[in-house]
């Protein structure tokens, strides 16, 4: 099941005991999923949702809280409609429901944001407002670089009201207009997790957090692997360059090179990929890596001084781009 469907399924099964919170959820769900229509001179309230369990929850809450019967119509997938949709409709008592839920103000005008009783309600009402909005038009993407919890809104006023509700819950949300559509977006991973819990989707939050953690572990492992590969490549290039310089040093010095420096140099040339520690173990008698490094450093220094005196290419001349490319 996709993350969005998981959240909506869990929220639809959530038991809410507070009447005020249940009213706030219904008002928000109707505002974000529905609309007011005039049919034969009467106000009809409709809400279109994408899961049957949401439609059944809304129908039950409308009856339990307000005593009005709602009818659920199923719109089967066909043509441009990819998925089955569910329309919850209250026709006979539409105007009364619209007034009681705050969709219409005292003068009978449509409310553009969220009803005043929801905006000025308790923290539990703010949680319920988000729950209703998410059930109506929410989405949650998989954890990742572009993960987001998002709600499509019927207008900028509703979007700003939802941002305000999030602020009351300690969550930073932003209102955006995307391709002519008003949306409220939460992108921070911690904020997404907190909001899921606030809405009542704790189980889905745990699943989302687990996937997020797994992704972060994989990303860290990949970074470390790339880092290790880069280090290995650098080490290999450095070893090849050192061997080439030592080879040139032995050519420059010829028979004048001291035996102990020549022995260290030959080890470097014969074991080009070995570390200094490994070269020390191969020496006879064995040496520390610092001793090996010191002898090779003195060998190169002697050779470069002689090359400068004689005006011939020094040890650095042996390190060519082609040599490093092949490393």
UniProtKB/Swiss-Prot annotation:
Family named by the database record: Belongs to the WhiA family.
DNA-binding region(s) from the entry: 275-308
Annotated source species: Mycolicibacterium smegmatis (strain ATCC 700084 / mc(2)155)
GO BP annotations, alphabetical order: cell division; regulation of sporulation
Keyword 4Fe-4S: no
Stretches assigned to coiled coil: none
Tree of life domain: Bacteria
Segments of this protein annotated with the region Disordered: 304-327
Transmembrane region(s): none
Keywords tagged on the record: Cell cycle, Cell division, DNA-binding
UniProt-recorded Gene Ontology molecular function terms: DNA binding
Protein name, per record: Probable cell division protein WhiA
Gene giving rise to this polypeptide: whiA
Function text: Involved in cell division and chromosome segregation.
InterPro entries in the cross-refs: Homing_endonucl, Sporu_reg_WhiA_N_dom, Sporulation_regulator_WhiA, Sporulation_regulator_WhiA_C, WhiA_LAGLIDADG_dom
Cystines in this chain: none
